[in-house]
Amino acid sequence: MANTTSAKKAVRKIARRTAINKTRRSRVRTYVRKVEEAIASGDKGAAEAALKAAQPELMRAATRGVLHKNTAARKVSRLARRVKTLNA
């Protein structure tokens, strides 16, 4: 347990940030899942639309420090490659 006032405040702050980051991470996963479901169904139009929605969400998470920027870029790249090979 935190003893000093500043440590107690830090604990509160971390709890708030954790909740926010958890929400953002969940949101990213939802968008990525929608792209993967569209790819699995074989619907290229839906997959492209889902990717277009997921890409800014992934990059926003990287900007906010939820994901590393290279991780976000890698995820976008791999999803884009899979969408591109659909009906190729």
From Swiss-Prot:
Domain of life of the source: Bacteria
One GO cellular component, as annotated? small ribosomal subunit
Provide this UniProt record's keywords sorted from A to Z.
Ribonucleoprotein, Ribosomal protein, RNA-binding, rRNA-binding
Q: Which GO terms describe its biological process?
A: translation
Give the molecular function GO annotations: small ribosomal subunit rRNA binding; structural constituent of ribosome
Q: What does this protein do?
A: Binds directly to 16S ribosomal RNA.
Q: Supply the NCBIfam families for this chain.
A: S20 (TIGR00029)
This one is known as Small ribosomal subunit protein bS20
